[in-house]
Design a protein with these regions (language model features):
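ABC family nucleotide-binding domain
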Residues: 1-153
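Conserved switch/coupling elements of ABC/ABC-like ATPase nucleotide-binding domains
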Residues: 155-160
Length: 160
């Protein structure tokens, strides 16, 4: 591990960019950017200030989109995608830097049950096949029950 308590803000930003992927309930996608460009974006800010070359950004973005089942949607903009597909773009964006940890805030909260199940299947696969640590916030007990470990919070404090 690494001691982040003494790091400066720019060092913390680099750690967050390299080691942690973030997935949000509201997707946080850019309206005018294609799925491929959404996923390439984190690579422009990574690797200790050394930008990843454009061809490598493209290759890695395409790989991440393929991993979440969107190889055929790379040129689509968010308005052309379903909610489940938008969340998969967000997951691909979170994965493109090969993080050790994936932080997911209500990743199925804005989705229908079928799309939500597809997202959970992707998260399970990332954990079981790649050994990725996934920290998920949810109010849905049926999703929490799928986790190896559950930590309950109340008013910002651990209660269980």
């Amino acid at each position: 591990g690494m001691d982040v308590s003494r790091m400066r803000e720019n060092e913390l930003a680099q750690v967050r960019n390299r080691e942690i992927g973030f997935v949000f309930q509201s997707f946080n996608l850019l309206a005018r950017a294609t799925a491929r460009k959404q996923v390439m974006l984190p690579l422009q800010y990574s690797r200790n200030g050394n930008r990843v070359p454009p061809a490598e950004r493209r290759r890695r973005a395409e790989k991440a989109l393929s991993e979440v089942g969107l190889a055929d949607r790379m040129e689509h903009r968010p308005s052309e995608l379903s909610g489940g597909q938008r969340q998969r773009v967000a997951i691909a964006r979170a994965l493109v830097n090969d993080p050790q940890i994936l932080m997911a805030d209500e990743p199925t909260g804005n989705l229908d049950s079928t799309s939500g199940a597809e997202i959970m299947e992707i998260l399970h696969r990332l954990h079981s096949e790649q050994g990725m640590t996934i920290v998920m916030v949810t109010h849905d007990q049926s999703l929490a029950d799928q986790a190896e470990r559950i930590i309950h919070l109340k008013d910002g404090l651990i209660v269980e």
